[in-house]
């Protein structure tokens, strides 16, 4: 019988898939420290019921810094001592994996079946890579491979007991010798290579070394949502992934999914663990840094005061070098300072820079012997009072030492983490960044950069000495993260719940330097949520409920709450601080024709640079009320070229003669209080013989302009009355 040639390639596959008598697989690694990388390795193996024997824990590492130089011979020495018991174990397969930068994504059976499917004739198999490390001059001596990578990598290899014993015992090795060079020289010896029956997994059918090929290796999901690594260059799906050299950040990305961590159908597989709650409330440190002009610090401090954590269990560290925030800090400390366990405060002009302050805070925290330290910047606004409690519980439950709550600028994709990092050390967008930010993928994620708010447990806090000065060419937060990456400390971002947001402060410094008395007033575009909370009247949203009827003080004169008392007070202070009130005459150079028919003592919004903000405000908050009351009239966006604050004083201009406004409709907002700030005042609508006191601070009168509502401003008899006037849609 003749066998058709095209069927021959199928025979090994059929044989391999019917193998039932697989050898035992023993997995071993060498690790002198219990690092985050080792924990990840063990967790990924455990997910597939693989037990890894860890050798060398607690032993002093003498093998050099293998990230940047040759070394690692100590691993061979430790393995050589251990391998004795497998000298004659021809029915046992030994696998070695590096400890700190490897992730498993398959069980023992799958690994062994893949080995026998592709390498059944071999006794030793090493992973392959595109670089001839550590001695490039050896490249010509390597055997040519038909397809795939041709250079040996010693981070992942497997073989039968006797061959593993022999290769580890061939030569004596010093701790500082290079382990990869050791195996390379054996592989390049053709006699030894054949004797040991060695081969390389050149197409990454089992072992994937990432360095130099990260663009080829992507994340895919099976139909059931199970994650797998896919090598697009060779159309293979490697089972064990090694982040050798500078590819560790990419391994961290893949490691967020592989090892049965995240499933596209089921979500995070390691989340939702039973939270390790304890009645014991540990002493923690709370560190706040204000090192640039940031708006709404007052609100940030209020949220800090509302944190659901006993203040007597908090060591408080505050650093503020911004003059505009000094009073905010003083007010906060006066109200809450004595409640804290202890505190250190730097508030005002200081020679201590932001970088030095952060390093000092770390040491101050350690000296207080805290269990956790939470470092936050002034632009982190937390609406979730349990943020610290949650992070502490996650740190304990998930065994993560550095974790940040995900917060971002509202309505934008800018957040406090990077999903990837470019070759120059700056931001790069990861494939999953958008999904994490939008909440389409939820969990806790190992990322290369976190900032704005970070929790350290005690162990990591001890390791962070001078981390913010690790690289002074970088910003302090980038320096800390680089220190963490270079030293194997994983940085996690948690997006399992909504914690708050980042305050936008990019252009705030410019507003401050312009000499504004209350620069937050100009923040309606950048930080609308906080602006609204501070400056919109608390009763405004009630009137926008469908069933609510807006009050009419006179026919078609609607009276409703609009601005907070604080806004009214600050607007008055801004205008008085500006001080260039018109003289009340008909001559007005601010107007196009230079003539004002009904003059007042006033300052226009465009004079103080508030025109754009006020137009947006009216379109956002006034127009919806107009559409609810004057039904059938729509004009979006609203227009106005007459927006101004009027000042009435008995000795200056106490009243205003009857007139029509040059508008489709107008609003007048009372800015101060009758009986407290002035006497008299009010508005009389002549056609209806109806008078409105207009004395509720922050309330707006809205009425038609040109035709029906002839009105006059009644005399202010004592004090000073201020109103805000806008002629809308002239």
UniProtKB/Swiss-Prot annotation:
Q: What residues does Fe cation bind to?
A: 659, 661, 711
The UniProt record gives the binding positions of 2-oxoglutarate as 590, 648, 721
Q: What Gene Ontology molecular-function terms does this entry list?
A: iron ion binding; L-ascorbic acid binding; procollagen galactosyltransferase activity; procollagen glucosyltransferase activity; procollagen-lysine 5-dioxygenase activity; UDP-glucose:glycoprotein glucosyltransferase activity
| Region of interest: Important for dimerization | 664-707
What is the protein's known function? Multifunctional enzyme that catalyzes a series of post-translational modifications on Lys residues in procollagen. Catalyzes the formation of hydroxylysine residues in -Xaa-Lys-Gly- sequences in type IV collagens. Transfers galactose onto hydroxylysine groups, giving rise to galactosyl 5-hydroxylysine. Catalyzes the subsequent transfer of glucose moieties, giving rise to 1,2-glucosylgalactosyl-5-hydroxylysine residues. Essential for normal biosynthesis and secretion of type IV collagens. Essential for normal stability of the basement membrane.
**Region named Accessory region:** 281-507
Q: Which SUPFAM superfamilies match?
A: Nucleotide-diphospho-sugar transferases
Name-wise, this protein is Multifunctional procollagen lysine hydroxylase and glycosyltransferase
Q: What is the effect of changing residue 682 to D?
A: In let-268(mn198); lethal effect
The annotated consequence of residue 131 to I reads: Nearly abolishes glucosyltransferase activity
- Native organism is Caenorhabditis elegans
UniProt-listed Enzyme Commission number(s): 1.14.11.4, 2.4.1.50, 2.4.1.66
**SMART domains under this entry?**
P4Hc
Q: Where in the cell is it found?
A: Rough endoplasmic reticulum; Endoplasmic reticulum lumen; Endoplasmic reticulum membrane; Secreted
User: What segment(s) does the record annotate as region Required for glycosyltransferase activity?
Assistant: 20-280
Q: Which GO terms describe its cellular component?
A: collagen-containing extracellular matrix; endoplasmic reticulum; endoplasmic reticulum lumen; endoplasmic reticulum membrane; extracellular space; Golgi apparatus; rough endoplasmic reticulum
Chemical reaction(s) catalysed: L-lysyl-[collagen] + 2-oxoglutarate + O2 = (5R)-5-hydroxy-L-lysyl-[collagen] + succinate + CO2; (5R)-5-hydroxy-L-lysyl-[collagen] + UDP-alpha-D-galactose = (5R)-5-O-(beta-D-galactosyl)-5-hydroxy-L-lysyl-[collagen] + UDP + H(+); (5R)-5-O-(beta-D-galactosyl)-5-hydroxy-L-lysyl-[collagen] + UDP-alpha-D-glucose = (5R)-5-O-[alpha-D-glucosyl-(1->2)-beta-D-galactosyl]-5-hydroxy-L-lysyl-[collagen] + UDP + H(+)
């Amino acid at each position: 019988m003749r066998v058709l040639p095209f069927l021959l390639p199928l025979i090994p596959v059929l044989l391999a898939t019917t193998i039932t008598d697989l050898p035992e697989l023993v997995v071993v690694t060498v690790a002198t420290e219990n690092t985050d990388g080792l924990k990840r390795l063990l967790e990924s193996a455990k997910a597939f019921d693989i037990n890894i024997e860890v050798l060398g824990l607690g032993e002093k590492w003498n093998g050099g810094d293998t990230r940047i130089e040759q070394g690692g011979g100590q691993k061979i020495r430790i393995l050589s001592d251990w391998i004795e018991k497998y000298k004659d174990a021809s029915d046992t397969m030994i696998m070695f994996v590096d400890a700190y930068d490897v992730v498993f994504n398959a069980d023992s059976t799958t690994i062994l079946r893949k080995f026998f499917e592709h390498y059944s004739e071999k006794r030793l198999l090493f992973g392959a890579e595109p670089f001839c490390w550590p001695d490039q001059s050896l490249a010509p001596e390597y055997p040519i491979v038909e397809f795939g990578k041709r250079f040996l990598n010693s981070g992942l290899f497997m073989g039968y007991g006797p061959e593993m014993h022999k290769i580890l015992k061939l030569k004596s090795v010093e701790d500082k010798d290079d382990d990869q060079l050791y195996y390379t020289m054996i592989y390049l010896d053709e006699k030894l290579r054949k004797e040991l029956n060695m081969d390389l997994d050149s197409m990454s059918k089992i072992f994937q070394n990432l360095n130099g090929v990260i663009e080829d290796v992507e994340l895919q999901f099976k139909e059931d949502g199970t994650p797998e690594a896919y090598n697009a260059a060779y159309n293979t799906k490697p089972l064990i992934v090694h982040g050798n050299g500078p590819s560790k950040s990419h391994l961290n990305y893949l490691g967020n999914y592989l090892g049965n961590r995240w499933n596209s159908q089921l979500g995070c597989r390691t989340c939702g663990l039973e939270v390790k709650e304890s009645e014991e409330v540990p002493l923690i440190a709370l560190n706040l840094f204000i090192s640039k002009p940031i708006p709404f610090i007052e609100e940030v401090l209020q949220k800090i005061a509302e944190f659901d954590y006993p203040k007597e269990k908090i060591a408080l560290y505050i650093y503020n070098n911004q003059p505009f925030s000094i009073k905010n800090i003083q007010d906060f400390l006066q109200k809450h300072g004595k409640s804290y366990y202890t505190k250190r405060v730097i508030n005002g002009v200081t020679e201590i820079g932001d970088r030095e302050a952060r390093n000092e805070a770390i040491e101050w925290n350690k000296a207080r012997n805290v269990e956790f330290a939470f470092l936050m910047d002034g632009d982190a606004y937390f609406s979730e009072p349990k943020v610290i409690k949650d992070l502490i519980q996650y740190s304990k439950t998930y065994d993560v030492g550095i974790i940040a709550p995900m917060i971002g600028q509202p309505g934008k994709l800018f957040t406090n983490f990077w999903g990837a990092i470019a070759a120059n050390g700056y931001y790069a967008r990861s494939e999953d960044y958008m999904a994490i930010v939008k909440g389409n993928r939820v969990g806790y994620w190992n990322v290369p950069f976190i900032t704005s708010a970070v929790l350290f447990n005690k162990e990591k806090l001890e390791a962070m000495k001078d981390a913010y000065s690790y690289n002074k060419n970088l910003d302090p937060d980038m320096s800390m993260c680089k220190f963490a990456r270079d030293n194997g400390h994983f940085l996690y971002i948690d997006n399992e719940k909504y914690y708050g947001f980042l305050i936008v402060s990019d252009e705030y410094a410019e507003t401050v330097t312009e000499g504004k008395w209350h620069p937050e007033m100009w923040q309606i575009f950048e930080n609308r949520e906080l602006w609204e909370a501070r400056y919109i009247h608390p009763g405004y949203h009630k009137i926008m409920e469908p069933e609510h009827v807006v009050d009419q003080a006179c026919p078609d004169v609607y009276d409703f709450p609009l601005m907070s008392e604080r806004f009214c007070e600050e607007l008055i202070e801004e205008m008085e601080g500006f001080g260039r009130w018109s003289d009340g005459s008909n001559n007005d150079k601010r107007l196009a024709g230079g003539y004002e028919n009904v003059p007042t003592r006033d300052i226009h919004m465009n004079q103080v640079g508030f025109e754009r903000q006020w137009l947006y405000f009216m379109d956002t908050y006034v127009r919806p009320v107009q559409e609810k009351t004057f039904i059938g009239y729509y004009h979006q966006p609203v227009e106005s070229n007459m927006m101004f604050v009027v000042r009435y004083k008995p000795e200056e201009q106490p009243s205003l003669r009857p007139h029509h406004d040059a508008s489709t409709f107008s609003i007048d907002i009372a800015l101060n209080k009758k009986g407290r700030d002035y006497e008299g005042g009010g508005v009389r609508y002549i056609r209806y013989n109806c008078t409105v006191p207009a004395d509720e601070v922050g309330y707006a009168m809205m009425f038609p302009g040109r035709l029906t509502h002839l009105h006059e401003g009644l005399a202010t008899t004592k004090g000073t009355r201020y109103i805000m006037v806008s002629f809308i849609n002239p």
